Structure formats: structure tokens, C-alpha cells
Amino acid sequence: MFQKALPALLRSDKVLKRAADANVEQSDFDTSLKDAADTIDKIRNAGPGVGQSELSDRIGDLLLSIVNASRIAGVNSEESLNYATKKFINRFELQEQMASVKDAE
């Protein structure tokens, strides 16, 4: 029914779009963001003693809410994540270069 060979981000976007097209998923942008915020609160309130399985489940829910908000807003979540990763890499490489210069002094 749903391709499992796709990367998780792309797969979740396609599943959410299909659910929306079938009128199964009725959430709007604000609801998706509220779902994400609620999930963050659950993760935060669970504390450090929460099990890995429960934490993994909640983070998965968070990611799905974010992908849904992106889809509703017409933003390609794959491209957004790639761009954010590229920005992080640029900052990280700059920090490495600055540390290298400082070590050389």
C-alpha cells in the first residue's frame, strides 16, 4: 500500500498527503503546530527517566507533526531539512577552522 523503500521524511509526507486527499486527516497548519508543541511538552515533562522506546515514539510523533505542518504550508520538508543541515555544516566547519587557527597560535 505505502512504499517502505522511501526515506522516512519523504514517506511520511506522501502518507500524510494521501490521508489529506482522502479526507482522513483534517488538521490545519495551526493544529499541526499545536500537536508538535504538545508533543514537545510531553517529551520535556517525561524527564530523563523515560525509556528509549517511549522517547523514540514521541520523537516520531513530533517529526510527523512537523512534516504535516510543512506539507500544509506548501513547504518541501526534505528540501527544508537539507537546507538547515547545510547551514549547520557551514557553521560547524567555521567553528572547526576557528579552533584550528586558535590551536596554531
Q: What residue ranges belong to the model's regions?
A:
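Flexible "arm" and connector segments at domain edges
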Residues: 1-59, 63-105
